[in-house]
């Protein structure tokens, strides 16, 4: 609402130049995937998801200045819903005209019942969204309705548009029997829209959609929004804001939620508690993910450079002992992030696993004590500090003893052959408990610092050996090489001239 109020008062944010780079990337993606058949396990790759994500956000960013006599008295975001404003949107105009209008020409040949390829799917859904039109060609909101005071009428029109974009994706999934194709419905289409109503309208009134194996990510997206309202008031733990469009969360926020709504971990995030959150931002070279950790309430801003499209991810895991156990799977590592391998995507509580944390890295930048070493020029010996007894496993303040999930007892009436089978649910419960105990008992940050210091000491031991050899042998001799730091790749100042 802050955005609409600012617009009403004439406070208009500076509209940035059209990001032609995202349009170019979108065109290349469509060309690359135009002939790629959609099969049962086909999904949209991480790189292509991020290109789609950028296109929708850049379209939103380029909305035109709103006329005083063309504003919604209800606060509805008409700049993204009506032809009056969309046709003035410079990004939209550039997209339609790009490459002699080739994308728009292809779009006009498509309809929802003939799409069979990935490129067709992406172009059709994205162009419906940025054109502000339903599948039948009608606009989300007619220009004559911009200033309407009929709250129920406007809310129903926006709700219909929101449902149509999701219903269309499910229709394609059902026809092709596909599990993982998914784009979502952007944040502004949820203006005064109840997620629970959308979920029940789509799944309860369409018998063909009852098979949740079809359109798994779409189902997971709508189910999550059905149990987590947009404005949670006293229950909110996080709030995302982009261009004045806000959304609050009380659960871990999987990547398919942020991606489907159009939010990014690089947006403004406000924390309402001191519970830790892990903000996943990119893949790393250990087949895992890099994350930033925030502990204090207030504004949490990721200051890292935005990664490339093939590496960037958007997901938040809440570390909160009071999280409802019924929904704790939303924070499981392999569900909170969409795997780049289609066959490994997890989207249901029954199959969610919480493994692989050892491959992830916390990347908050902290100043190390040994960045600048002045001790070489200090004639006084380094004082040995007095010992300070501490627990064998120092813990952060927020690491209270975790509440472990109960493990099912064996059923005494089962046959031996049945009892020795390992239930996947029990395995997931044990794995979850193990991860929580590990976080509780081990200060991973302290271990990381210790590893870093040990590696640095090893480098200085080599430097010292070189100096001794040079001063005692007094003639050239094969000297040991000072290799880059195994963790951060740095070379100590005293060893930079020794690299062979």
Curated annotation (Swiss-Prot):
Effect seen on changing residue 441 to A: About 50% loss of interaction with OPG154. Complete loss of interaction with A2
Domain of life, source organism: Viruses
UniProt-annotated location(s): Virion membrane
Protein's recorded name: Envelop protein OPG153
Taxonomic source organism: Vaccinia virus (strain Western Reserve) (VACV)
Pfam families per UniProt: Pox_A30L_A26L, Vac_Fusion
UniProt family annotation: Belongs to the orthopoxvirus OPG153 protein family.
Any one of the GO CC terms: viral envelope
Entry function: Envelop protein that mediates acid-dependent endocytosis into host cells. Plays an important role in endocytic entry of the virus by acting as an acid-sensitive membrane fusion suppressor. Low pH in host endosomes triggers conformational changes to allow de-repression of viral fusion complex activity and membrane fusion within vesicles. Also plays a role in bridging the mature virion with structural protein OPG152.
Lineage of origin: Viruses, Varidnaviria, Bamfordvirae, Nucleocytoviricota, Pokkesviricetes
Cysteines engaged in disulfide bonds, as pairs: 43-342
Impact upon substituting residue 48 to R: Loss of pH sensitivity in the fusion process
Summary of subunit composition and partner proteins: Interacts with proteins OPG094 and OPG143. Interacts with OPG154. Interacts with OPG152. Interacts with host laminin.
Chief localisation class: virion
UniProtKB keywords: Disulfide bond, Membrane, Phosphoprotein, Virion
GO BP annotations listed: adhesion of symbiont to host via host extracellular matrix; fusion of virus membrane with host plasma membrane
